[in-house]
Amino acid sequence: MKISDVKKALQTVETVTFKLPDGSILPPHFHVTEIGCVTKHFIDCGGTERTEERANFQLWEAGDYDHRLAPQKFLHILDVCKNVLGDEDYDIEVEYQQSTIGKFGLDFDGTTFLLTNKYTACLAQDACGIPDKPDQESDNCCTSTSANGCC
């Protein structure tokens, strides 16, 4: 989801609600504590230099149980952030504190913002020797005559 998508969605809802990938809803007293631009400059395992940029929203909950972030206030925060983000329509990554800081993608189902799981991946599979997945499963891949009897 991009910043422009969030702005459009905020214009259609009466309350701002976030749902975690496990289906649980963030407490309604959450705060948006940071919005910024994150740049990741790195070299992948194949030796290719890469740069990724995205907007980062940090969500946090405090003990102020009466706090609610109205859609209009969230839009105002996004407008203030133009000083940092400029006019770039970045993809969004969301941080939310759980047992550690979780990083999520963001989607919208028409009423609720959905925090989506993010996964690691090799960006240079051809260069670092990761084999292609076989097209068909073998019938005898897990037989007792396997080298160690397991799959």
Give the predicted meaning of each segment:
Residues 13, 27-29, 50-54, 87-89:
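Short connector loops at helix/strand junctions that flank enzyme active sites
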